[in-house]
Amino acid sequence: MYTKDTIVAIATPQGNGGIGIIRISGIDALEIAEKLTKKQLKPRYATFCNVYNDNEIIDHGIVIFFKAPLSYTGEDVVEIQAHGNPFILNLIIKAALNCGARIAKAGEFTERAFLNNKLDLAQAEAVADIINASSEIAAKSAAKSLQGDFSKEINNLLEKLIYLRMYVEASIDFPEEEINFLEDQKIHSSLEEIYKVILAIKNSCKQGVILAEGITLILVGKPNAGKSSLLNALAGKESAIVTSIAGTTRDIVKEHIQINGVPMHIIDTAGLRNSDDIIESEGIKRAIKKIQEADQVLFVTDDYTNSQVKFSDIKEIIPEFYDQIPKDIDITYVHNKIDLLKEVPHNHANHIYISAENNIGIDKLKEHILNKVGYTNQNESIYTARERHVTAINNAFEHIKLAKEQLELGNGELLAEELLIVQEYLNSITGEFSSDDLLGEIFSSFCIGK
């Protein structure tokens, strides 16, 4: 068991509330709690009592003792449920510090749970994901990962992979056998099965990252093309000021919405043009910077002299900014104000025709946005995933393809080597093999009381 010193932190959000919870974990948790309460605490019993600093009553509330290893961290844990006043909670924290505890680092309770094998790394990350989920679907997906569904799938895959690798290595270790193990159909079928499972997990992880992190959309275009109207139409409310005056939006305007349960971070930017206005020029600089950070760019135009606008044509529309826009960025051309046209062109490829002011074509645009990122609404098979999970799975997928190539070539040693590499990438997801730097980066993103 992982045992160090004893840590303490407030486990509930900042601010006033009906209840505030203080969590203590470590080898001296019970001793400290009994000093604070002047009570003998029984495991898994809720004890109503006063909380003291020396002999001075700070508050009264409910105290619960969880004896190791039957606790969140796997250590002795005490939770004090007091009144949710920050001043009172901080007084209790100070009293605990005086008794020998120290303030917990961000994510340290969950880190201790991981180190004590109460959960694996993917489950630990799911704790943060379920706290930060910004949609119902994201919360449900995070809950599945927290329950271990994602880890079970990875572990089942690892079991098959390890068995196959052992079988392949046996064929290398016993070359005197007359049987050519590499021609055994069992190896071919097992490798193909593993390949298909990794591919399925790869697709599921991609969906999971979208749910966990959302999609960042940037609205760009010339002034008065209708970017702010489009932001309001997508958000379903008046988030940005809309006027007929070009250059109204001078700074970044952000809105967070959901499309079919997928979090969307929409950013409206200043219209791209040369301007002598210092404030507007600064807004335009920020717009260019945001374009480089986007998952998708919605280029809004009301110029119908060229309804087949392509990326190269942006040089004609905004020539002064053409060189500053990444050439490989995913751009959708949103042709606005179609209510002013006698005949409306059909949507095609990356060209969507709308009227933001009259809410025409907005649903088609939303559908297009989801299709562009490859999101499919298959909730049952989606787990909340991190970018590092996707990277690990993508790498595993590339090496399982190389393993198939080596099998076809009859290279047993290289096949075994590729299978080992795949195993290492999969192990990194659940934390079977993880560097201290990676663990520090993951747990530092948690809130203090978790």
UniProtKB/Swiss-Prot annotation:
K(+) binds at N224, T243, I245, T248. Its cofactor is K(+). Residues 214-374 form the TrmE-type G domain. (6S)-5-formyl-5,6,7,8-tetrahydrofolate binds at R23, E79, K118, K450. Transmembrane segments: none annotated. Its EC number is 3.6.-.-. Mg(2+) binds at S228, T249. HAMAP family: GTPase_MnmE. Belongs to the TRAFAC class TrmE-Era-EngA-EngB-Septin-like GTPase superfamily. TrmE GTPase family. This is tRNA modification GTPase MnmE. The gene is mnmE.
